[in-house]
Amino acid sequence: MELKGVQPSNGSANGNGTTNAASTEKTDAEKHTPERTNWGNGLEFLMSCISVSVGLGNVWRFPFTAYENGGGAFLIPYIIVLFLIGKPMYYLEMIMGQFTSQGTVKIWSVVPGFVGVGYGQAFGTICIISYYSSLLALTLYYLFVSFQSELPWSYCRDEWTNCVNSRPQEYVDNLLSGVSLANESARNFSAIGSVANEETEKLQSSSELYFLNVVIKEKLDISDGVGDPDWKLTLALLAAWVVIFLVIMRGVKSSGKAAYFLALFPYVVLFVLLIRAVTLEGARDGILFFLEPQWGELLNPTVWKEAVVQCFFSLAVGSGPIIMFASYNRFDHGIYRDAMIVTTLDTLTSLLGGITIFAILGNLAHNLQIENIRDVVRSGTGLAFISYPDAISKFKAVPQLFSVLFFFMLFVLGIGSIVALQSTIVTIICDQFKGLKYWKVALITSACGFLMGLVYVTPGGQWILTLVDFYGGTYVVFILAIFELAGIVWVYGLQNFCDDIEFMCNRRVSLYWRMCWSFFTPVMMIIIFIYSMVTIEPIKYSELYFPEAANIAGWLLFAIGAAQFPLWGLWYVSRHPQGTYWKSLKASMKPSERWGPANPETRREWVIFKNHKAAQRATQKDVSKLGFFWRKLTNFCGSNK
């Protein structure tokens, strides 16, 4: 199609070297438009993408998700999902951000009727930010107390009945004397151990009781409220947000420099922990337990759903950071290479993190003389704040050092992720209101993030975290990612999109990308989303079901996020009438005059390129012997010949 939003001058179009005065004046005015800040260099962008995509999801979430969904066999659906959904979505978001030099909302000048996708993703991002910062607060708390002469979770308090010390000798002595730890069926954070006989009293480790009674002061019923914020965790939450603000206050100028540390330091610690872990007794059993495939799970649709959820969570697609980071690139930056590096590194890091974690859990099972490693594995926060601290307390040499390294690594990983999420929100606001100072918006949004995070440092905070993550994070992000892909590929058109990529990257789009974007990726995502909705069950925390009011609040949260798409679409149609409502709706499905490269000179070159492509296809259509069906099929698959 011929572009009419911005036309080349007569001189440019005719090739005679002349331009009219009106075109010159317009060009000069456009040249005075402030340009977007760019990364200091391409490596800053790559490091920033690594810092957000290689985060807590790799070291924390992936090991347990893989273990619960087939062990080593989970890698097969995960890698398939990575190549058919993860990589295509990641590359697409990089392209959209770099091509337009705009954030998550402004990119929808490509299909203005889909602007609600950007606002909905912003809502989902805010939900994730709200609870993510509370995890940083917990991590900071454990980091601070790790400097004590004795790890505070390694021994029991007098008021804790049925408690077993996490310190190694006492633990083993208790086990050998016939007192064992039982897996508490009523709790997600179960006690470690086995039952010697039916009358054996159920015991809990000191690391578990420390987390539940000292750190979060957990409530097992939130029907009467969540309680008041804990002052220690509140201070840790405040410290986390101060660090976040300092990193993002100058935009990519400051976050780009911090990205080197945020991306590389965790690998240093992870390799140190890996070397230590694989040398521990029982490590081999833990690693084999993690990698041992359960082939029957491959036929379970839930496993494939979890692979998609893990892929989205790990790569941070569908929530805006990748688009935002890419928008600060130079227009000709080689993003294809970066997309391949980050997505591959993300998978390798997940595997590395899983081996490290399960090697240490294997050592924990060995020390406790427990044959089934399943009894020492926990999900969610229990893995990071119960199982791992419990294992560290049994290290014979300087357990404090390894505790500090582990929790500092978690904190850095978390900061890398939340910096990207928070910067996404700040960029959306600054794109919308050009006159606002970036640091002021960063300060205000950081203060709001701190206030929202207070609910998660209450005794009922883990309940709220589970609720918001399930309804406001996972499902909102997933459904809007489907609309995101559909808007670009099916409404704007894959052929147009491939032309834009060819112009920007100076390379043809391969069949792999075209087939993924046009068919495999959207179809798989739609099928998995429908399956998730059909098989959805009431959520639980610590094996306890949420109150009915909490479930209603969760569905309301999901509805608010998902409703952003149609509501903002209707708003755009009402604000841009084209006669009848049907004509206005059709107009909202076409690119606005703002769509295209931000730089005026690049934009004019792009218009010429697109019009040349349109004329070329019109000529080919006249002489082509292909039937109507085959022409439509090649257009659908984005053939840019």
From Swiss-Prot:
Compositional bias per record (Basic and acidic residues), positions renumbered to this chain: 25-35
GO molecular function: amino acid:sodium symporter activity; D-amino acid transmembrane transporter activity; L-amino acid transmembrane transporter activity; neutral L-amino acid transmembrane transporter activity
Recorded GO CC terms: plasma membrane
InterPro entries: Na/ntran_symport, SNS_sf
Signal peptide span: none
Membrane topology: Multi-pass membrane protein
Subcellular location as annotated: Membrane
Transmembrane segments: 39-59, 72-92, 109-129, 229-249, 258-278, 307-327, 341-361, 401-421, 441-461, 474-494, 516-536, 552-572
Similarity comment: Belongs to the sodium:neurotransmitter symporter (SNF) (TC 2.A.22) family.
PANTHER family per record: SODIUM-DEPENDENT NUTRIENT AMINO ACID TRANSPORTER 1-RELATED, SODIUM/CHLORIDE DEPENDENT TRANSPORTER
Name under which the protein is recorded: Sodium-dependent nutrient amino acid transporter 1
